[in-house]
Amino acid sequence: AIYTPSDYAMGFTEKRSVVTNAAVHKGQNYVFNIDLKDFFPSVEQGRVMKRLTLNPFNFSPQIALLISGLCSMRVKREQPIETKQHDLDKQFMYVLPQGAPTSPIITNMVCDTLDRRLAGLAKRFGLRYTRYADDITFSSMHYVYSGNGEFTKELARIINTQGFVINEAKTRLQKLGSRQEVTGILVSDKLNVTKKYVREIRSLLYIWD
């Protein structure tokens, strides 16, 4: 079977990019960005294995265990856990490695439910929603982004129940009239790149010349 990421996943899939991600949010009064903390290491082998046993893959548990193991790496837990299994299980866990070529598409697979629930939340509040890897964006013509409001509380609840944590340091609300940026693309009026990006490209061209 061929896997196709959700309509809201804009990264690491054919015919989608930072540009198509940004285009969804062009010309909105409010652009709300959040980041998922430690995105790839947050996905443990067990979650990958379970996903591989579901549609459209339907692998046997044995095959799913093998594939998920090949795509994971062992890391030490910050806090050992209580378990009846081998002592190593108390100290270590197996997670998706940052930078591995397999990790991005696997996170898209694992995040199917997250995308579906966040898209449902967006529809409920009349918002636009996309996700590019760990970079989540909502936008709208109206304001619903109060820190203690119903939308933000439900947003945090959904993300936490899906095994992720919001990186509060990277949360930002951008209003029309200020610089609105989505995955490095300016979206206030028309799609454009930032001056910083232009400077970086010029520097690279100078080095290569």
Question: Where in the sequence are the language-model features?
Answer:
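Active-site-proximal segment of RNA-dependent polymerases
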Residues: 1-40
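Glycine-rich, flexible loop/turn motifs
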Residues: 8, 92, 169, 178, ...
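Residues in well-ordered beta-strands of folded domains
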Residues: 11-13, 68, 174, 186
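Conserved polymerase palm-domain catalytic core
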Residues: 24-133, 137-165, 171-175, 209
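Active-site and adjacent loop segments of nucleotide-processing enzymes
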Residues: 181-209
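Flexible glycine/acidic-rich beta-alpha junction loops that bind and position SAM and/or redox cofactors
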Residues: 174-182
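Short capping/connector residues at structural and topological boundaries
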Residues: 17, 101, 178, 187-192
